[in-house]
């Protein structure tokens, strides 16, 4: 599911993301991934779009060439940023702050609120709204145990997960808005890029 969810520019925005994960298609994805992993996957909570925080200003696709970016150690993330001609570097999150201080990397990418939680506003002046990935958090239960429950309990669990996902999504949207305002108040620069140009650039990415 991590590789599916991490495909760049799969969603046009938050509304599209929520529409997919609350649709029959979203249910099919959860069922297929859950069956393969031995879990019952339920709900769907918005994590916010991933943005790039950087030590230097970047506004266009060309600006990313050679950019030293920390990425999660997942194949799809590495290929995404290689496609953009950056220099992706897998690092554990607890190493990223120091790596940014020492210029081992020049940036990292995560949702706004998550990036602020790691205090990247202290080492990254530029926050670039690439919005390249919208991530989904799901509720999981052991599939065998779930299937052993009475049908009415199964339905109640699914309903609770759906409700919780909607509530978490609303809170996350608010957290991202507050985080963006906080970094602006602290003197960081939030850069709006042409996300359509980026999405078009990834049109043949697979």
Regions found by a protein language model. Give the residues of each.
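N-terminal secretory/targeting leader peptides
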Residues: 1-16, 25-27, 31-206
């Amino acid at each position: 599911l991590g590789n599916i969810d991490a495909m760049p520019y799969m969603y046009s925005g938050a509304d599209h993301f929520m529409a997919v994960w609350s649709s029959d298609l979203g249910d099919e994805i959860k069922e297929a991934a859950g069956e393969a992993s031995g879990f019952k996957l339920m709900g769907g909570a918005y994590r916010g779009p991933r943005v790039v925080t950087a030590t230097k200003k970047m506004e266009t696709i060309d600006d990313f060439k050679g950019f030293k970016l920390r990425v999660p150690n997942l194949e799809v993330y590495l290929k995404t940023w290689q496609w953009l001609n950056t220099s992706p570097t897998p690092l554990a999150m607890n190493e990223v702050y120091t790596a940014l201080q020492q210029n081992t990397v020049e940036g990292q990418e995560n949702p706004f609120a998550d990036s602020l939680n790691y205090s990247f506003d202290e080492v990254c002046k530029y926050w670039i709204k690439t919005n390249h990935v919208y991530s989904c958090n799901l509720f999981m239960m052991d599939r065998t145990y779930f299937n052993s429950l009475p049908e009415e309990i199964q339905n109640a669990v699914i309903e609770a997960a759906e409700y919780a996902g909607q509530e978490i999504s609303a809170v996350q949207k608010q957290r991202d808005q507050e985080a963006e305002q906080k970094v602006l108040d602290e003197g960081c620069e939030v850069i709006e890029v042409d996300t359509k140009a980026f999405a078009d650039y990834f049109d043949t990415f697979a």
